Amino acid sequence: MKYKMIASDMDGTLVNDKSELTERTKQAIIKAVDAGVLFVAATGRPFSNVQNVNGLFDKDMPFIIFNGAAAYMGKSEKLLFERFLDFDLAKETFDIGQKLGIAQIVWTGPRLWGNRRCDKTVRYESISKNLSMSIVTDLAAIKDEVDGISKVLWIDDPAKVKELSAEMCAHFGTRLKCVSSMPHFLEFISNDAGKGTALEEIAKLYGIDRSEIIAIGDGQNDICMLKYAGFGVAVENAPDEVKAVCDYVTLSNNDDGVAEVIEKFILK
């Protein structure tokens, strides 16, 4: 099978635990792109936080951000699509978080909001690449000044996030998607969003069949993408529930798992 697209999650998959792209992985990606393969980074991060990958390319490559709630072209910064969360659902989510006393982040396109300044939200702000966090305590107050809500994100310890995820999935049902890109994050996005949906849309834009796609990931939020791709790959550090839906398990994110896949299935 000649694969035409590689889609890879970033944190826990493409980058190592120090958030670094290793030289081996960089070279594998560059060689794949030079061979005509489309490389798509698919992440929960905002667009401002994917420039370490974007900088590898001379070509304009698509990036899936906010766990599939939006996609941009890397060089031209052209918006390909955006799937906002229904405002009333976003407000309901935010209000529940306020009652529970949870540290919350809200993305409205490229703009960053937090429900208060605390260790968790300030740390998130610090990794958001030159973006300043505005404070909001009631989403109704910003409804008229934003285009829409890309996602609401709760930050808590991993055990609490696991508990909250089960509760919120039961509460919202199919009205929205609850996903977790990191053990301490619980994210709420539109039911029309998701990495799998976004990957399908990009594949259609480029005329690529799902059988011609390799997807690589490590988290619960990657499962829909891994299932959509013709060849789903889990990194070794992924939990068993992710490995169970995949066709292949590669090395861990600290051992150049993405590079191993590219070298074995693209550059062989």
Predicted regions and their residues:
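Hydrophobic packing residues within well-ordered alpha-helices of enzyme cores
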Residues: 25, 50-54, 164, 168, ...
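Short, structured coil segments at secondary-structure junctions
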Residues: 56-59, 67, 75, 172-174, ...
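Short active-site oxyanion
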Residues: 36-40, 59-61, 151, 211-212, ...
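Mg2+-dependent phosphoryl-transfer enzymes with acidic/Ser/Thr/Gly-rich catalytic loops
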Residues: 1-5, 22, 187-268
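Active-site phosphate-binding/coordination module
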Residues: 20-122
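Conserved acidic, metal-coordinating active-site core of Asp-based
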Residues: 96, 100-216, 220, 224-225, ...
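Active-site metal-binding loops of divalent metal-dependent hydrolases
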Residues: 10, 45, 218-219
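Asp-based phosphoryl-transfer active-site loop
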Residues: 2-18
